[in-house]
């Protein structure tokens, strides 16, 4: 999917109006920064730069997109011709991914003519806002976990493309793996997974489900133990995988209480 129409209409109408007034070619500097952080947060973590640079490199208007803009009378024909020839020729510089940022600090600076810089505004903010928010939250989790590895498994709770960005952002912040295969393919992130309750219910018993999973994936797999009774599920998981059991997963109930009980 292209990136050119992943923008707000007014970005293009501003360019259209600026072309009419002859100001679209004026050199400008745009800075990306946050005014404040959420309460209780002392810093944020930058992520999304790599995804953004890829998006800028691919930023082209297709013939179909240009026809849409013309048919919808979004901009004038001369502006459509400018869009047809558009290639970003400015400069982009800023923080590296994984670095911390604070309110007022310029995370990213885009320099170029007004038209070629402002056309990227929505795309820049869309990617950096989301990815940096995920990375900032993930960094706090990594800090709390200490030496224990964390895996990102949030794909089903995000829009499908955002899930890839979230997996990448979490990995940048220190997560060890993701369940998202597209993130693994595109960005080389280690992938992992467990099993769902449906897999357990597919079998005649929890023991049979665990045995099938261990037979397929080895004892180092992670077994889901809360389909029925957690305490019994843990016992069955250990019996199925032995001392080489990778981990058990709890997906419901009061997690802080149950996790502490299982670890004990």
What is each PLM-predicted segment?
Residues 1-216:
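Ordered alpha/beta subdomains of enzyme catalytic regions
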Residues 198-264:
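Glycine-rich phosphate/ribose-binding loops and adjacent secondary-structure elements
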């Amino acid at each position: 999917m292209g990136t050119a129409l992943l923008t707000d209409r007014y970005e293009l109408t501003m360019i259209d109006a600026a072309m009419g007034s002859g100001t679209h070619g004026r050199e400008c500097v745009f800075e990306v920064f946050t005014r404040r952080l959420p309460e209780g947060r002392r810093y944020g973590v930058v992520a999304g730069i790599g995804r953004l640079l890829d998006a800028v490199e691919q930023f082209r208007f297709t013939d179909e997109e240009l026809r849409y803009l013309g048919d919808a009378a979004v901009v004038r024909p001369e502006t459509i011709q400018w869009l047809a020839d558009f290639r970003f020729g400015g400069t982009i510089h800023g923080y590296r991914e994984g670095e911390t940022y604070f309110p007022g600090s310029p995370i990213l600076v885009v320099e170029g003519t007004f038209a070629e810089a402002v056309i990227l505004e929505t795309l820049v903010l869309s990617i950096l806002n989301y990815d940096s928010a995920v990375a900032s939250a993930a960094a706090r989790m990594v800090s709390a976990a200490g030496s224990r590895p964390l895996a990102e498994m949030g794909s089903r709770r995000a829009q499908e493309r955002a899930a890839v960005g979230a997996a990448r952002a979490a990995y940048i912040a220190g997560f060890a793996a993701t369940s998202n295969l597209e993130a693994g393919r595109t960005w080389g992130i280690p992938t992992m997974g467990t099993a769902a309750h449906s897999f357990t219910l597919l079998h005649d018993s929890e023991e049979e489900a665990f045995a099938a999973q261990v037979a397929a994936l080895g004892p180092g797999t992670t077994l889901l133990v809360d389909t029925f009774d957690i305490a019994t599920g843990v016992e069955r998981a250990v019996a199925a995988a032995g001392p080489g059991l990778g981990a058990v997963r709890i997906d419901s109930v009061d997690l802080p209480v149950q996790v502490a009980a299982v670890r004990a």
